[in-house]
Amino acid sequence: MTDIWKPSVTVAAIIERDGRFLLVEEETSDGICFNQPAGHLDPDESLEQAVVRETLEETAHDFSPTALVGMYMSRYVSSRTSLEVTYLRFAFTGKLGAVHDRPLDQGILRTVWMSYAELIACQHRHRSPLVLKCVEDYLKGQRAPLSLLYTHPTAIGAMHA
């Protein structure tokens, strides 16, 4: 039997405050990069739960998603290993909540607030081209209701309880 190809599903939080966007500076196999708070969908969680968790882990902030900015697919090829991965990214916007006194996720160096102009100026340090694309879509007012996404209870662990 042939293996079935599967993309890597990720989530990202597009968080804007006073014309600036919340990013993380992180260590990657290709060097230090900027990214939105983002990460992989874990087993037994919804996409919304994943973006809440990733934002907390990477920024120490609570996050409440209010809309889906977009769904994006891109291919990443490591400059170091030539490994290819296709990502399917779900980008959310929402409300930033309380900050907690907790360490940031492993590999996250710090959080940074950047203007759109600053984001453009440092594109060479973006984790992927989707960092800028998601912000541009957000700035264009692109939003879809969260009701567009449906997670059946069997996908979030109800069958495992």
Question: Where do the protein language model's features map onto the residues?
Answer:
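Conserved N-terminal beta-strand and adjoining loop/helix that marks the start
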Residues: 1-22, 40
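Unchanged
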Residues: 41-64, 75-129, 160-161
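Short connector loops at helix/strand junctions that flank enzyme active sites
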Residues: 8, 16, 36, 63, ...
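Generic structural signal for helix capping and beta-alpha/helix-loop junctions
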Residues: 31, 73-75
